[in-house]
């Protein structure tokens, strides 16, 4: 039994791909299913002996778009079932290809339900990429479901969050609740809102999609919808075992069991809202500097995704400025082991000095929240 996992190579660096791959390989390992990675038909050819000698399947990790359709057309002619481990609900579903999908419509609906119950009258979307497949779908869903009837969207065509933020600060429309594309965007917006109004979270509720590890440790922690990649991975395995069982099934289509986590970023009841055009607009460079937190946050999230108990002990120690020997004693490790881990962290985020890395941790993480790990 073997899975052959593929995706666009340029997508491998994203935290969403890392989470999907981690969940999928863990699910396969638990069932002693072998897995291989490939990125072209030539690379797959190297494993011909494997997929011709034992029941096998291709799993395409997808985030939508034209490139996905090209990959599907490339692989669906191969002598193996194809499962698309996607991110969203497909408009049309093939009877020849299996899909595991996220239902962003339900997540959007649940966010708006929470806003409505909290007494929010003026929801808006901020920062979504209008030209992106996933974000354009979320925007469309929001406009259909927005109970205020405004369908207020501050998006970006270029993919630059700063463009959307500048649109927001030009708006004379009141906003009392915001949905952004993902958690890391939310972390950037928190920084900008903090500069404009330290009490913004009493006037405005914030929610996003993704449920990253990092966003649960920020202040305030953002309310998020979890796409359910862990559930999706289990369903990929279930589909695979059904397809190879000889049950006469050519394809299966399932929806991931997502979750929703409400946090203090939606704790305020009946927020009064903010008219951003009445606020002092941060300078363009200030906005861009805040938005640069996205890349920093993404790199910290990569560390947290693979973190064990020792990693969390090291991170807490660095945030408090503890000596390496003290961290090592408390973690029951040698100082050399702790130094090696810190070296790997700095390589991940692209920093040379430990003090710089410690400062970054304190910038993004609330120490009071991370001590629970």
Sequence positions of predicted segments:
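Alpha-helical recognition/docking segments in bacterial nutrient-uptake
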Residues: 1-113, 170
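Periplasmic-binding protein-like
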Residues: 3-7, 54-63, 81-83, 124-128, ...
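Flexible loop/turn connectors
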Residues: 27-28, 96-97, 104, 172-180, ...
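Hydrophobic alpha-helical segments within soluble ligand-binding/sensing domains
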Residues: 89, 98-126, 160-166, 186, ...
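An alpha-beta-alpha
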Residues: 109-149, 252-267
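Linker/hinge segments immediately adjacent to helix-turn-helix/homeobox DNA-binding domains
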Residues: 238-306, 366-373
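Helix-turn-helix DNA-binding segment
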Residues: 295-337
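Basic, Lys/Arg-enriched C-terminal extension of HTH/homeodomain DNA-binding domains
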Residues: 342-373
């Amino acid at each position: 039994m073997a899975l052959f996992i593929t995706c666009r190579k340029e997508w491998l660096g994203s935290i969403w791909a890392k989470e999907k791959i981690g969940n999928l390989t863990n699910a396969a390992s638990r069932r002693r299913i072998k897995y291989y990675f490939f990125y072209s038909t030539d690379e797959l050819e190297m494993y011909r002996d494997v997929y011709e000698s034992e029941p096998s399947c291709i799993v395409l990790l997808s985030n939508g778009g034209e490139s996905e359709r090209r990959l599907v057309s490339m692989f669906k002619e191969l002598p193996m079932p194809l499962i698309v481990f996607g991110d969203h609900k497909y408009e049309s579903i093939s009877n020849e290809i299996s899909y595991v999908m996220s239902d962003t419509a339900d997540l959007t609906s649940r966010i708006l339900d929470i806003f409505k119950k909290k007494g929010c009258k003026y929801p808006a979307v901020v920062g979504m990429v209008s030209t992106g497949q996933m974000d354009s779908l979320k925007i469309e869903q929001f406009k259909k479901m927005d109970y205020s009837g405004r369908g207020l969207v501050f998006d970006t065509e270029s993919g630059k969050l700063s463009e959307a933020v500048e649109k927001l600060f030009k708006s004379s429309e009141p906003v009392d609740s915001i949905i952004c594309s993902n958690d890391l965007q939310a972390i950037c917006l928190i920084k900008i809102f903090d500069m404009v109004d330290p009490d913004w979270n009493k006037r405005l509720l914030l929610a996003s999609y993704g449920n990253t590890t990092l966003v649960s440790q920020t202040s305030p922690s953002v309310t998020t919808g979890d796409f359910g990649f862990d559930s999706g991975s289990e369903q990929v395995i279930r589909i695979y075992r059904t397809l190879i069982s000889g049950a006469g099934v050519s394809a299966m289509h399932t929806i991931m069991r997502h979750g929703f986590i409400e946090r203090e970023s939606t704790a305020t009841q009946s927020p009064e809202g903010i008219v951003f055009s009445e606020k002092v607009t941060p300078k363009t460079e200030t906005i861009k500097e805040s938005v640069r937190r996205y890349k920093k946050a993404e790199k910290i999230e990569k560390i947290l995704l693979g973190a064990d108990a020792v990693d969390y002990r090291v991170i807490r120690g660095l945030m408090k400025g503890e000596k390496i020997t003290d961290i090592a004693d408390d973690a029951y490790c040698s100082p050399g082991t702790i130094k090696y881990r810190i070296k790997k962290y700095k390589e991940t985020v692209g920093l040379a000095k430990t003090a710089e890395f410690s400062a970054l941790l304190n910038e993004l993480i609330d120490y009071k929240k991370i001590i629970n790990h």
